[in-house]
Amino acid sequence: IKEFKADGTIGIGSPRASNESNFALRSMVGEENFYAGYSDVEHESMQVILDLASDTAFHSPSVREIETADAILILGEDVTNVAPRIALALRQSVRNKAKDLADESRIPQWQDAAVRELAQYERSPLSILSPAVSRLDDVASDRIIESLSAVVSIGHQIANKISASAPNTGTSTEHSEAIEKIAMQLKAAKRPLIIAGNSNGSDVIKAAANIARALHDGSDNSAIDLCLLVPEVNSVGMALMASAANPLGAALQKLQSGGAKRVIVLENDLYRRAAKETVGAALTAAAKVLVLDQVTTATTAK
């Protein structure tokens, strides 16, 4: 351990490690030598998420608050795979229309059979823009399956329909009716909710934020619910600890060039985070490699 405390040692954290473990490694190697433990694309997306989290125009809703949303738009994220508990909350939220109809008819909420009979197929709008099918499609009011670039473009067009001042980089008119419908549903909602995540890069996140900001500008300046999903248990903690200038790619490059002689890898399989050839070359170039993990991985085998 003593030789890893000397100069020339870098540390690579992990989004599946605890804050305490990541902090201990960062304290040992120094903040400037502590690198993010996920792909460079994910690192860029996480920086965007952190910036949006500090913006007062947006509110990060709890699971209970998600259940109260009365109009929802999901952009480019498979919620069931990334956050199954939130997916369940979304299934609950589409029943809010039925609850409103029951209140108008003076039917108590606890009379579930009567509420369902009254509502029939009436649901609160849940729109999904995605490059693939998802397990929430059965409760969606609108589904648009397009390429990721098209999803981003449609997102910006929806924002521009909500507020003319919102940036609009989309030009296609292929889904103009659906775009108009989704924009009107979000504008009419008492508690609209926009959902995106970092599974498909930062452009989708920026499009979601564009829509939420358009809703905020057209409201009484109350914060708009913007739910940004991350795939691992401590992705946010990892992003808060690793500098924006310290992506994983920079760490691998530093090892290959000889700028760092030793590396400590914390609870991470680097072969899942970057190109195998790049990771292999970096670990081979290092004089000493220390991997701390509870499971056997390609990185521990190296």
What annotation goes with each model-predicted range?
Residues 1-302:
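Catalytic alpha/large subunits of respiratory electron-transfer oxidoreductases
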